[in-house]
Amino acid sequence: MSGGRFDFDDGGAYCGGWEGGKAHGHGLCTGPKGQGEYSGSWNFGFEVAGVYTWPSGNTFEGYWSQGKRHGLGIETKGRWLYKGEWTHGFKGRYGIRQSTNSGAKYEGTWNNGLQDGYGTETYADGGTYQGQFTNGMRHGYGVRQSVPYGMAVVVRSPLRTSLSSLRSEHSNGTVAPDSPAADGPMLPSPPVPRGGFALTLLATAEAARPQGLFTRGTLLGRLRRSESRTSLGSQRSRLSFLKSELSSGASDAASTGSLAEGAEGPDDAAAPFDADIDATTTETYMGEWKNDKRSGFGVSERSSGLRYEGEWLDNLRHGYGRTTLPDGHREEGKYRHNVLVKGTKRRVLPLKSSKVRQKVEHGVEGAQRAAAIARQKAEIAASRTSHAKAKAEAAEQAALAANQESNIARTLAKELAPDFYQPGPEYQKRRLLQEILENSESLLEPPERGLGTGLPERPRESPQLHERETPQPEGGPPSPAGTPPQPKRPRPGASKDGLLSPGSWNGEPGGEGSRPATPSDGAGRRSPARPASEHMAIEALQPPPAPSQEPEVAMYRGYHSYAVRTGPPEPPPLEDEQEPEPEPEPEVRRSDSAPPSPVSATVPEEEPPAPRSPVPAKQATLEPKPIVPKAEPKAKARKTEARGLSKAGAKKKGRKEVAQAKEAEVEVEEVPNTVLICMVILLNIGLAILFVHLLT
């Protein structure tokens, strides 16, 4: 057998013995670009026993087969340690995975690298779960046993993934909180949940129900469903107890807070009962599990005597069941998200009450049957656990043998190539230093966080802070000249704050965008639009112009962007002085000249066609009454001119009166229509509620 050093094209290298052109005997090999290292024994190009070290510092010590971990071995990955069997690169069939920082561990069977079959989970506080697993989750039948309440871990945040979580690595250390059921409301959680405890003080069913349009004081509000009204209603024990938990608290594996989905009522309602729990009280759940949650039939009981037997859904009492209180009283019926919605005590409808009682009995029988099966599965899990412990001890012996082979390979590599770089020890040193830094940071983090959040202290030069602040002044950016809605927005307060200038929209007179001191292309693009926007904005706020002597020009200026003459030529000034009409006419002209300022910005665009000039002539049918007496005292020589002016004034007044009449009709019609619609909607809702209450 010969030996030496061989460098690969991908940057890796091998230093050790070989035979037949393949690695054989003992040797050390690095991966592509020198990343990763294996040191140990080889068999014609394949690893046999040794130690593989990743650049992160994670290691595997054990046996290999066909280039994959196979047999017995120990994997150190982050803060987790796996000892047991390996099958073609995956954990299993029997093994133990435990946390190096806490007492959390799993002992049992595995499949494809996940907990599968039967096993025992032990959590950081000492609580346990024995039963079935599927794809890394508690699924099937099992028994969850908590530690005394005073020793149970306190869950402070549903988003926090504890080191005791055995399934947290599959979600990269972060676990999303359990979403509430689709038909259940989001409700506040109790203040201090404990791992493994699902029994918590809750509010009454009335407090948990969403408040509708009709309260208890109304006629429809007095229609109630049949529910328990016995002595439980006057006692503190009447309140619902069973509550969702973190799939078994932060002490459970990769479980997150379903606490936000279950508690009815305010947080302070839960405090009295939590304070009354004895520190030695324990809790046990025996029954079905689905997707890592209590779902199906099951029994949950406390050492104090509190007990629930019935159906569960997502760690909540959901279905038919019975709650037995420590004083012997019972609360039974149909539960919905931990709240009793149908009881059997009030016998308003005897037939319906008997059906509910039958379903409750069926739920209790199913829960007792599920509890018996769960105890059997727990016994099987205990036997699997003992077998996994034996495999873990054998894996420790295999790791010792692998380390011996690794030391031999390193010694041989130094002899064959003294200058050969061995990255494995360096990786492990980095990992140790990183752990020391993380531990020191964990000790310093709480006081830093207690002082305050870091976001307000971010410097003003930070681009993120700058981006957060700039959208506020840019809420109304200057628009192109062809968009009239922009000058309309600031119109009500423009006279006070002068917000119509293009620069004022950005908060600075000469700036564009969020960086006024830096010229940008966007500013150059917007500059051509400034004159148009300024003209439109200022035109809307100009004082009314002097009354013109030609009403036709003022009227049709709303339809055209220029003055259009439709009446006869202007009479000489002497004629205007002799006519008695100039006094009432300016009033009409002034009243008409004021509204065109806002209307002129919209009417010309919405109704641009000019042929509307002959249309108003047909509408002037009701006007001769006020105009005829004014035209009588005029001289006959100027009847033609006076008639032209009177007709124009009549047309103008007619249009104004018709427009005012239409606006009045619209306002009169809108109010009763809205009221009627609201009344009809409320009536329909009331009838629907009445119908539902009568049916239920």
Swiss-Prot record:
Residues 474-487 have a biased composition (Pro residues). The modification Phosphothreonine is found at T470, T483. The chain crosses the membrane at residues 675-695. GO terms for molecular function: DNA binding; phosphatidic acid binding; phosphatidylinositol-3,4,5-trisphosphate binding; phosphatidylinositol-3,5-bisphosphate binding; phosphatidylinositol-3-phosphate binding; phosphatidylinositol-4,5-bisphosphate binding; phosphatidylinositol-4-phosphate binding; phosphatidylinositol-5-phosphate binding. The keyword Repressor applies. Abundantly expressed in skeletal muscle and heart. Weak expression in stomach and lung. The modification Phosphoserine is found at S162, S165, S440, S442, S462, S479, S527, S533, S593, S597, S613. Proteolytically cleaved by calpain in response to cardiac stress. The major cleavage site takes place at the C-terminus and leads to the release of the Junctophilin-2 N-terminal fragment chain (JP2NT). Phosphorylation on Ser-165, probably by PKC, affects RYR1-mediated calcium ion release, interaction with TRPC3, and skeletal muscle myotubule development. MORN repeats lie at residues 14-36, 38-59, 60-79, 82-104, 106-128, 129-151, 285-307, 308-330. This is Junctophilin-2. PANTHER family: GH28348P, JUNCTOPHILIN-2. The gene is Jph2. GO terms for cellular component: junctional membrane complex; membrane; nucleus; plasma membrane; sarcoplasmic reticulum; sarcoplasmic reticulum membrane; Z disc. Interacts with TRPC3. Interacts with BAG5 and HSPA8; the interaction with HSPA8 is increased in the presence of BAG5. Gene3D superfamilies: Histone H3 K4-specific methyltransferase SET7/9 N-terminal domain. A motif (Nuclear localization signal) lies at residues 488-492. Belongs to the junctophilin family. Disulfide bonds: none annotated. Residues 573-585 have a biased composition (Acidic residues). Residues 1-674 are cytoplasmic.
